[in-house]
Amino acid sequence: MCAGRMQKVHSDIRGPIFQEANRMSAAGIPILKLNTGNPATFGFKMPDSVRNALVENADKAVAYCDLKGMPAAREAIWAYEQSKGITSFTPDDIYIGNGVSELAPMCLTALLNPGDEILIPSPSYSLWTNAAYLAEATPVFYRCHQENNWQPDPEEIKSLITERTRAILIINPNNPTGALYPREVLQQIVDVARKHQLMILSDEIYDRLVMDDLEHVSIASLAPDLFCITFSGLSKSHMIAGYRIGWMVLSGEKYCAQDFILGLNMLSNMRLCSNVPAQSIVQTALWGHQSVRNYVVPGGRVCEQRDYVYKALNDIPGITAVKPRAAFYIFPKIDVKKFNITNDEQFALDLLHEKRILLVPGKGFNWGSPDHFRVVYLPRIEVLSEAMGQLGDFLSHYRQA
């Protein structure tokens, strides 16, 4: 018997389509999986300095640590986030967790009461929606549109605020679109939050995977007077998703958040501490040689694969896509009239069965129309070329029944 609060929780990235792909794999059918942003499975290697730090610290990283995290790790995170312009916080305002995926539910459980509302972008990674549902709160979606390069509209955000709204969440860079929010848009969101006295939550897990010489701006750096929580980690930027290392930074005015902070401390105590061996590499990862940067500059593997898949998708009749500026996802639009698509999950299943390619439909990212899907462009170009060729061939005759 399952608790009622679980009824709305979903994970289409690892949901029914993923389970069908696993069934096919178990039957000996090879599947090209373009559904998860798990760099190591596509041949990406962690920096040598990070590996060496893990080995060197292995004997010292065996006991529980402080509930918020190892002091040395929090000091390194403090210095890093300060370098991005975030002020009004100390190492004691940092909580280290087993990835942002652990910290998001902790945060919303401590923050939200049943019936409270949190503004969440659409499309967006389902972690945050599920965390809101587990807190018995209501996610309210503000739409980001392809025609606007997937940027949020501060006016729409403002129009959705009610007396039950507690916070505005942004995901920057965005998953699944790869959009990067410019300073002027972030400033407008800060102005809305300030006017309505709302907290700002910012998921910035992809902040070190920005391309095209663009700058990632942490929204908390624009709001030193507001209570902000910034989430980040090493899973994606250092290709070590399995190490489970993330953090959240509480900055700005905290006088209004003392009960929330007390709740966070209680929840942190319940899990004792996060992964200590992973914490032992934080200082080296953040302040050592940033070899991961080589992936996202022109000629770098992630950048080249981004350029390829963007062009290949737009060359398929009936598909249009906006060029991602960060992360390793693209969220193309499919002409639903041309292909008679009314159910994007069925489209993904049909593609899986015929071409053995696993994608995630837009439904999995809080997108209310059946006209988008996400592609992970972590595979090498020769693999992406095969996948895009198969997708084009599939769509050349596909019409949903």
Where are these regions (language model features)?
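Conserved glycine-rich beta-strand-loop-beta hairpin in the small C-terminal domain of fold type I
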Residues: 283, 299-310, 321-335
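Conserved core segment of the aminotransferase class I/II
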Residues: 221-300, 310-312, 395
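A short helix-loop-beta submotif of the ANL/AMP-binding
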Residues: 133-140
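Conserved PLP-anchoring active-site segment centered on the Schiff-base-forming lysine
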Residues: 110-132
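Active-site phosphate-binding strand-loop segment of PLP-dependent enzymes
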Residues: 140, 145-216
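N-terminal small-domain helix-loop-helix segment of the aminotransferase-like
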Residues: 3, 7-99, 106, 273, ...
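PLP-dependent enzyme catalytic core of the Aspartate aminotransferase-like
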Residues: 83, 158-159, 340-342, 350-359, ...
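Helix C-cap/helix->beta junction micro-motif
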Residues: 27, 135, 195-196, 226, ...
